């Protein structure tokens, strides 16, 4: 907690106003669409309604916020998160850098509202999809104005190859993929006598909406398997309480090289169940047969 002492020009002697600063959590949503929402394919509104679309079961949203606050490790947060709408209009009418610029402009124009009650405490960001670029712009503006960004978490960041982060605050990017079994021929004789021996193999598929793009300037980028998801649901699967445990693991894991049959491959020290790629390095995973 930070105590700011403000002395009025009219104050007599030691008459002072004490303002208590408290950390603030900012949630920046991605693209939403009312028409697609009518088919249950997208959030239909921004801000709280966007996040609660993915956290729909009872108590899930509150649990998400509480777990996020514990993850960031600060204390005495402001009562409610601040919401920012990072959505483009059509989902393809803005580049990542366009949205970063918009986020920067929004923060500069609304600096008092965004930082209300913060004092000298830290601001923390959680963004999803298109909101990641917008959050990057907001963070840039806040730091330029002298505020402290404690950390920014970017979930399923869209168009990560079209914007950067400055690197002057902790920023972690995480994207999900899913596993799908595909049948492969074990042998092939001829078109007249094709092989009928098939074996299913597990293939990793990345989130089709955002692809594999590490944002320049992030501290670390992780691409992981979101089990029990599929093509239609993997993009929103990063918005869940467990994502913060995954982020903790991302921060502390170690990637090490090993030689196997004359080739170098990369493994995660202590074993690997969920990770497919760390930063620019694909890692061995026993749950993936085909990369």
Q: What are the roles of these predicted feature ranges?
A:
Residues 18-120:
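Active-site catalytic motif of lipid deacylating hydrolases and related acyltransferases
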Residues 25, 29-32, 96-208, 216, ...:
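Serine-dependent carboxylesterase/thioesterase catalytic core
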């Amino acid at each position: 907690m930070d105590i700011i002492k403000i002395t009025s020009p009219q104050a007599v002697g030691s008459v002072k106003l004490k303002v208590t600063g408290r950390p603030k959590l900012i949630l920046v949503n991605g693209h939403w669409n009312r028409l697609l929402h009518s088919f249950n394919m997208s959030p239909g509104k921004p801000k709280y309604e966007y996040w609660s679309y993915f956290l729909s079961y009872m108590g899930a949203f509150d649990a998400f916020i509480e777990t996020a606050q514990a993850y960031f490790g600060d204390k005495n947060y402001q009562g409610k998160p601040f919401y920012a709408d990072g959505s483009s209009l059509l989902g393809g009418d803005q580049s990542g850098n366009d949205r970063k610029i918009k986020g920067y402009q929004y923060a500069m124009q609304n600096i008092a509202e965004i930082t209300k009650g913060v004092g000298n405490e830290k601001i923390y960001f959680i963004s999803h999809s298109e909101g990641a670029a917008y959050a990057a712009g907001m963070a840039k503006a806040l730091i330029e104005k002298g505020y402290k960004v404690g950390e920014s978490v970017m979930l399923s960041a869209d168009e990560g190859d079209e914007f950067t982060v400055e690197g002057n605050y902790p920023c972690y990017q995480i994207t999900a993929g899913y596993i799908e079994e595909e049948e492969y021929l074990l042998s092939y004789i001829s078109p007249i006598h094709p092989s009928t021996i098939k074996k299913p193999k597990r293939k990793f598929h990345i989130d089709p909406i955002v692809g594999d793009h590490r944002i320049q300037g992030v501290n670390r980028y992780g691409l992981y398997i979101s089990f029990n998801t599929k093509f239609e649901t993997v993009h929103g699967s990063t918005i869940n309480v467990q994502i913060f445990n995954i982020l903790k693991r991302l921060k502390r894991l170690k990637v090490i090289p090993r030689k196997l049959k004359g080739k170098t491959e990369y493994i995660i020290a202590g074993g690997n169940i969920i990770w497919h790629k760390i930063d620019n390095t694909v890692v061995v995973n026993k749950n993936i047969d085909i990369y």
